[in-house]
């Protein structure tokens, strides 16, 4: 509970009312700047070599910087086990495989790779994804122009590759090397005719994240362990948009280079107390550029921030295991601004008896890298977000404060959990929120305050498991110059969100059903009486209305069988949006040349089937 996506994408995850860029996503300790394929509809992380995924919404360990909304820590296997494992398979979007190969007693290689089949096989799944991605994009809009376009052709593909090399020099000295690349590429040909002469030009967009890291783990004795890590994460978004109708071309790029050093030490004082401490250095370089040839226009910006962080925390577990506490302090120093940011954090849990447990979490956080959303100056109408760096003036450092208290009940395979939270995030910019009303072109600095309750219920039976999550929250903006300084609902203010799910297992067959519901996101309506002779729309009270509520039902089934004594296989089928419900994800308005107003909507995926087959060795 408390985690959803208002637009059905993995590249726009909203945690307790935050935007996606406020989530710190780590792959083996390396920050990732891209989390989705197919512009957010497919996860960019191959699940078959992910050993553990930890999600923290509050009370985060002080070893994590950034991520004022959450931390999503994806970890690959980090220990040698001398077992060979491999697998390969396909579905209606991609093919892929993985291998975990022991080279010797002291060495192991892990490899995984996926590639889409969308550029040479057209499937029903791809058809639905295509409609969803290109809806209201420049490509669809070009087809609605003056009729000069006679043909167009898009070619899209994605791939990801990850490699991890494990080498144990001795029992107490371990080296780990990581490499991963995530890539999306789109080419779009547009042909027009003028005086019987055909002209074809190509637009393209490429989005990629490449990361590499080296880690050294040292066990000094049974109590002291240290880790040193070097990493580099680069992100590139390049687009060329050739507009035949209006006779211009636009070249855009957004580039990030993130280099870091991490030192961490863990000291076991005794069986109940551990001390963690460390140092981190980060250098982030963000570049944005844009060039138009008709009329000639060029813009370029480049910012670099270097930060240093020291941290320390104590982790305590009582002898009877009833009380757990983690208390720490992180101090960030931003070299460019000469400023310190002090971030205390705490997580305390206490068992009242065998069934009930109380929990208190609190944290301070800050981050210097965020995303801005420019709906008029986007990448081909598809990717509207670009990474930017704080300049401590127009783009301040984002700071958050959060606290929550929860109670949990666990008995007879029944889990009941309730958590009340309060979160205040300051330093956001209006350009990062994606306004599509009277504030679309405004640039102001403000905050949002979200408060609510997350509830989770899970019951397990012999062959059946069911759970329900419910979140109630209110989320309001406050900007000094917007809405006369009065608070108004956040663009992702989802008051109610419910998820129901059930999994049934019988022998080698597994079937799952899920239902997702949430109330509609805020909407600003145009005024009935518009001013004449203007080039803008007159709007009513900001975010005072709501789009229709969202409801989706999914179903999936998997059958597992043996092919040989050492080989097994799985066959699966899934249907997203089983009842083909038409959900509105977004609604906004544009002004036509004749001063009339048109309403545009973004629709959810329709009924989307998928079939998979995998072999495991």
Where are these regions (language model features)?
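N-terminal periplasmic accessory domains that precede
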Residues: 11-14, 40-43, 58-86, 388
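Transmembrane beta-barrel wall of Gram-negative outer-membrane proteins
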Residues: 93-117, 135-186, 208-225, 273
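Surface-exposed extracellular loop regions of Gram-negative outer-membrane beta-barrel proteins
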Residues: 236-237, 290, 335, 355-403, ...
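Outer membrane beta-barrel strand-and-loop segments of large Gram-negative receptors
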Residues: 258-262, 301-305, 309-311, 392-396, ...
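Gram-negative outer-membrane beta-barrel transporters
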Residues: 320, 422-424, 443-527
